[in-house]
């Protein structure tokens, strides 16, 4: 029979293993959604960043996407602009800066429809938990994201 510290270690490992499995499935899902939308997964990730963080400079997009070549982000933004997903505009505060902004109409709306089933499935799953449990789950997810962000930065630096 497991002692309490052993049971805790096992649960921590189970949570970690499940997190990695879910992350892998998420990558595969994003590849599939990008394919359905006729874009590549880097372009899809760019749209996801703009959706969650709002307008960003090309430099900030490149850093967040892990693109190291200067022309790579230009190619991503050019493709997305031609397809109607984003537009370039001037920063209202510093007119010298260019911001890339998500265009929520048109092709992006169709992309959101593809993601609708996942969003509904998550809402159904969340219904199984109390508000207090969801608060804990959200806190863990935010903190796990921070761990992943820091580990990714460490890898890029090394």
What are these regions (language model features)?
Residues 14, 18, 117, 121, ...:
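Charged catalytic carboxylate motif
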Residues 31-68:
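N-terminal helix-turn-helix DNA-binding core of bacterial DNA-binding proteins
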Residues 22-29, 114-125, 144, 148-151, ...:
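Alpha-helical linker/hinge and terminal dimerization helices associated
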